[in-house]
């Protein structure tokens, strides 16, 4: 009985604090907010597919919407013009990243590039990535790796002998092997411990800490084993990357060409005023692997899904690729430049299916006025790239349809200058690996449609294959894509 009384008074007290916080301390007009519940605010409205739930809410409350996730104010952005105002007009004010228990435990206490706080360390690490890891010269240097792995993929598909096969698994294997060779120097694919490790990491990145939003419920994270999972995952990741770095140091790899070799060279050179630490090498390598592998796999899986659902688009793409590469056994990266419809297909797949529909959160470092709204320092900001890509005001009444043709007569691109297409972000925090991802995605997709005629298995033809999504930070198909590929005789 006494416990019930204590619990009741605790709830009443926390409710009073919640209402007091909501009604006081406002310096100006705030963006519209859906009604929340005491203590948890709007947490209950996120849903399994957060990007879809927030898109529905934004249609009612507007493209700039303020949620209260427990005690944390989060600004949700669902339109291109508001994204531009934040990522261009007020880019510096929103360039910070919020710290979280998850990023601290899994990303080396935010020593990577993606989650590092905005400041001198982040600027130095981004400079290392842009100059030494992801420059056009470095991207070109890995051409042989891409070509070799694509050749292996094509041979694997031919072995299916025109029977239904798991396209998703083949694409995941390809992107994993390419990124492993580029970043780590060799493959770590198949059913290895590393594969299990990365699968666990992907699952954890799609979760969140209840205690981070509602501190007095932090014990729930401990009870459900979330804290223990983070600790074990962080240790397992560090054990793996420490061994990889040590193997590189022990070998005679001063002329090595993978990304860890490049980072170790930077460490040895000890530039004046800057020295890269060992923990930073591991953190940046983890960034490259997680971002590069997951992004490319997700895009290719959805691109093939949409092409199989839209045979006319598939036929048009095949006609373009086979015309340009007439008489060739495969598509090379030199052939890609003139393939306008291929590039349109990639853009349309990214528009409808951005690999990370809710972009990594930003955080304001100062008070900002957005339109007529006051945004206090410390407010988190999340861009709903999925909603922006389906905005009717930008894309028209057919915004939900897969139509690559919409990109043929427009200069809209995904490299951060056009805010209606934001799969890689924009501004200071844009993904620095855009060029690497684009080259891989284009040449893989071109070879798939050049080398094979594709169709859905008979059992999938009625619904033209489903487009159900998985849940998590990156959004794949919920179920693997199966298809039939028949070798095309050139």
Swiss-Prot record:
Sorted UniProt keywords: Heme, Iron, Membrane, Metal-binding, Monooxygenase, Oxidoreductase, Transmembrane, Transmembrane helix
Transmembrane segments annotated in the record for this chain: 1-21
Enzyme class (EC, first level): oxidoreductase
Subcellular localization(s) per the UniProt record: Membrane
Keyword Heme belongs to the record: yes
Cofactor(s) this protein requires: heme
Domain of life of the source: Eukaryota
Amino-acid positions noted as binding heme in the UniProt annotation, renumbered to this chain: 431
Documented EC number(s): 1.14.-.-
A GO cellular component entry from the record: Golgi cis cisterna
Record membrane topology: Single-pass membrane protein
GO molecular function: heme binding; iron ion binding; monooxygenase activity; oxidoreductase activity, acting on paired donors, with incorporation or reduction of molecular oxygen
UniProt xrefs under InterPro entries: Cyt_P450 (IPR001128), Cyt_P450_CS (IPR017972), Cyt_P450_E_grp-I (IPR002401), Cyt_P450_sf (IPR036396)
Family named by the database record: Belongs to the cytochrome P450 family.
PANTHER family: CYTOCHROME P450 71A2-LIKE, CYTOCHROME P450 FAMILY 71 PROTEIN
Record protein name field: Cytochrome P450 71A25
Species of the source: Arabidopsis thaliana
Gene: CYP71A25
């Amino acid at each position: 009985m006494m416990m019930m009384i204590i619990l009741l008074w605790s709830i009443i007290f926390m409710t009073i604090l919640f209402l007091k916080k909501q009604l006081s301390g406002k310096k100006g007009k705030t963006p519209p907010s859906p009604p929340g519940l005491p203590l948890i605010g709007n947490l209950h409205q996120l849903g399994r597919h957060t990007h879809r739930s927030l898109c529905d809410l934004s249609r009612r409350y507007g493209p700039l919407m303020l949620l209260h996730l427990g005690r944390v104010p989060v600004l949700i952005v669902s339109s291109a013009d508001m994204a531009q105002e934040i990522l261009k007009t007020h880019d510096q004010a929103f360039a910070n990243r919020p710290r979280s228990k998850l990023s601290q435990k899994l990303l080396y206490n935010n020593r990577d590039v993606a989650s590092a706080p905005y400041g001198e360390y982040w600027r130095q690490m981004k400079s290392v990535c842009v100059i030494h890891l992801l420059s056009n010269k470095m991207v070109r240097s890995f051409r042989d790796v891409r070509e070799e792995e694509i050749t292996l993929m094509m041979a694997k598909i031919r072995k299916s002998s025109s029977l239904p096969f798991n396209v998703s698994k083949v694409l995941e294997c390809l992107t994993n092997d390419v990124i492993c060779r580029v970043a780590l120097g060799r493959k770590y694919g198949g059913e290895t411990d590393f594969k299990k490790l990365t699968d666990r990491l992907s699952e954890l990145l799609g979760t969140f800490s209840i205690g981070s939003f509602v501190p007095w419920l932090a014990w729930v994270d401990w009870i459900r084993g979330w804290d223990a999972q983070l600790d074990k995952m962080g240790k397992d990741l560090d054990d793996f990357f420490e061994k990889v770095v040590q193997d590189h140091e022990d070998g005679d790899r001063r002329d090595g060409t993978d990304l860890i070799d490049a980072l170790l060279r930077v460490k040895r050179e000890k530039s004046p005023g800057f020295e890269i630490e060992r923990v930073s090498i591991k953190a940046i390598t983890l960034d490259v692997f997680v971002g590069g592998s997951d992004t490319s796999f997700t895009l290719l899986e959805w691109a093939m899904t949409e092409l199989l659902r839209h045979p006319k688009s598939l036929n048009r793409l095949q006609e373009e690729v086979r015309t340009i590469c007439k008489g060739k056994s495969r598509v090379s990266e030199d052939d890609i430049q003139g393939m306008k419809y291929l590039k349109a297909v990639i853009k349309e797949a990214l528009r409808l299916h951005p690999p990370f529909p809710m972009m990594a959160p930003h955080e304001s470092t100062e008070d900002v006025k957005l339109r007529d709204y006051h945004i206090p320092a410390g407010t988190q900001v999340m861009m709903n790239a999925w909603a922006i890509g389906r905005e009717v005001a930008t894309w028209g009444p057919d915004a939900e349809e897969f139509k690559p043709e919409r990109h043929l007569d427009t200069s809209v691109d995904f490299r951060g200058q056009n805010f209606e297409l934001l799969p890689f972000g924009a501004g200071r925090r844009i993904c620095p690996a855009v060029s690497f991802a684009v080259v891989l995605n284009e040449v893989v997709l071109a070879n798939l449609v050049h080398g094979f005629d594709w169709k859905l298995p008979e059992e999938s033809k009625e619904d033209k294959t489903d487009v159900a999504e998985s849940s998590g930070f990156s959004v794949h198909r919920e179920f693997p894509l199966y298809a039939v590929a028949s070798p095309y005789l050139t």
